[in-house]
């Protein structure tokens, strides 16, 4: 294999603790408890090793990263090592004192999530009463601090009708960028798929709404749009390709090529407590497993898109078929594409209740998926 370029970004999942209980959370079903989280000095070492490896962007996430009192200290170290710093937050713990500490540390950017523009529905989705007013205050604090305001709305069948109002609210808050992200069905999102998966008609209306707003707000607000795979003909690239541009560190120190990768139960992921980042990136077997194109089965191997979508998502392939090697079922050419079609067909007219993201609330698997025959 040719020389491995360093990862552009590192996602530091500082904790799985979070005041919210969103049913589409990308955290694993088995949430890691506070007692096994990396200590401050371990995260500081990771900041140093990331800089030496060539990482340019340091993203702090969770759970809710502001649960960690050492967050400003970690940001300051990343800034000292000349990495761009970004926090991905619910905003419910961001007050004046924390904002002052973050600015003193040198934070570059904060991405603020919203569950809906409708207060009652937003707080039903997030499972936290009073959250919306705290989020609005957080947006104001970010703007007053002089930072660019990026908002994230996760959309699904139970809030999609409010998309026009979400975009209006984003503009009113002074957002320079808004991400409209359809739920990605991994982890808790997969558990809640029937409660979240929109109809094709809902998706088409949402897509048209985004396209109209992009044209109308050109030069005012950038709108990113992430579509669901279930109505796609081609898969999305896995983080720009498995272990090509991105590395994720879990709260306990597992190093992952993407935030959902530990769902791949057949792979053993290294710990930063035992490996250096450089050794993980260049030599860990789990990182080599799906890097590049040599691993690809047909039809990926001979497809002219093989270095565009990189075979799609390994986590989705495994979650839906029990086979992590198979072409992503999102691809119309995948032997497992019917699994996607069947999921859409099975979608009920009435959304079931959410299974909320919290420790001890994950459903117990009642069957083991068998690989889909080619």
Curated annotation (Swiss-Prot):
Matching SUPFAM superfamilies: Radical SAM enzymes
InterPro entries cross-referenced by the UniProt entry: 4Fe4S-binding_SPASM_dom, Aldolase_TIM, Elp3/MiaA/NifB-like_rSAM, MoaA_NifB_PqqE_Fe-S-bd_CS, PQQ_synth_PqqE_bac, PqqE-like, Radical_SAM_PqqE_MftC-like, rSAM
One Pfam match: Radical_SAM
GO molecular function annotation: 4 iron, 4 sulfur cluster binding; cyclase activity; iron ion binding; oxidoreductase activity; S-adenosyl-L-methionine binding
Its job: Catalyzes the cross-linking of a glutamate residue and a tyrosine residue in the PqqA protein as part of the biosynthesis of pyrroloquinoline quinone (PQQ).
Metabolic or biological pathway: Cofactor biosynthesis; pyrroloquinoline quinone biosynthesis
NCBIfam families: PQQ_syn_pqqE, rSAM_more_4Fe4S
Keyword terms: 4Fe-4S, Iron, Iron-sulfur, Metal-binding, Oxidoreductase, PQQ biosynthesis, S-adenosyl-L-methionine
Protein name (record): PqqA peptide cyclase
Annotated residues for binding of [4Fe-4S] cluster: 18, 22, 25
Record carries keyword S-adenosyl-L-methionine: yes
Reactions catalysed according to its record: [PQQ precursor protein] + S-adenosyl-L-methionine = E-Y cross-linked-[PQQ precursor protein] + 5'-deoxyadenosine + L-methionine + H(+)
HAMAP family hit by this protein: PqqE
Chain's gene name: pqqE
Keyword 4Fe-4S: yes
């Amino acid at each position: 294999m040719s020389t491995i370029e360093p990862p552009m970004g590192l996602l530091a999942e500082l904790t799985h603790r979070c005041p919210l209980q969103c049913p589409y959370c990308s955290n694993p079903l088995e949430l890691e408890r506070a007692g096994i989280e990396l200590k401050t000095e371990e995260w500081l070492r990771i900041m140093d090793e990331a800089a030496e490896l060539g990482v340019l962007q340091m993203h702090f996430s969770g759970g809710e990263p502001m649960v960690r009192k050492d967050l400003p200290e970690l940001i300051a170290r990343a800034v000292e090592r000349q990495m761009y710093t970004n926090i991905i937050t619910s905003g419910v713990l961001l007050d004046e004192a924390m904002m002052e500490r973050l600015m003193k540390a040198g934070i570059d950017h904060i991405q603020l999530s919203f569950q809906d523009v409708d207060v009652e529905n937003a707080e039903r989705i997030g499972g936290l009463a009073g959250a919306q007013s705290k989020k609005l205050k957080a947006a104001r604090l970010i703007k007053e601090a002089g930072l660019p305001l990026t908002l994230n709305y996760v959309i699904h069948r139970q809030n999609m009708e409010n998309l026009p109002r979400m975009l209006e609210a984003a503009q009113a808050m002074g957002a320079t960028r808004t991400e409209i992200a359809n739920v990605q069905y991994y982890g808790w999102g997969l558990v809640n798929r029937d409660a979240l998966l929109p109809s094709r008609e809902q998706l088409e209306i949402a897509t048209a709404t985004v396209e109209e707003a992009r044209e109308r707000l050109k030069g005012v607000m950038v709108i990113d749009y992430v579509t669901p795979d279930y109505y796609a003909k081609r898969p999305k690239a896995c983080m720009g390709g498995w272990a090509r541009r991105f590395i994720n560190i879990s709260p306990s120190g597992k190093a992952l090529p993407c935030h959902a990768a530990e769902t791949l139960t057949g792979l053993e992921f290294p710990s930063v407590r035992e490996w250096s980042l450089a050794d993980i990136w260049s030599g860990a077997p789990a990182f080599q497993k799906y890097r590049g194109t040599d691993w690809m089965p047909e039809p990926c191997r001979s497809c002219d898109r093989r270095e565009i979508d990189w075979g799609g998502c390994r986590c989705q392939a495994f979650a839906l078929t029990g086979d992590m090697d198979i072409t992503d079922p999102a691809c119309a050419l995948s032997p497992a594409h019917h699994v996607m079609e069947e999921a859409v067909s099975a979608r009920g007219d009435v959304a079931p209740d959410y299974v909320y993201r919290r420790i001890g609330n994950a459903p117990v698997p009642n069957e083991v998926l068998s690989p889909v025959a080619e």
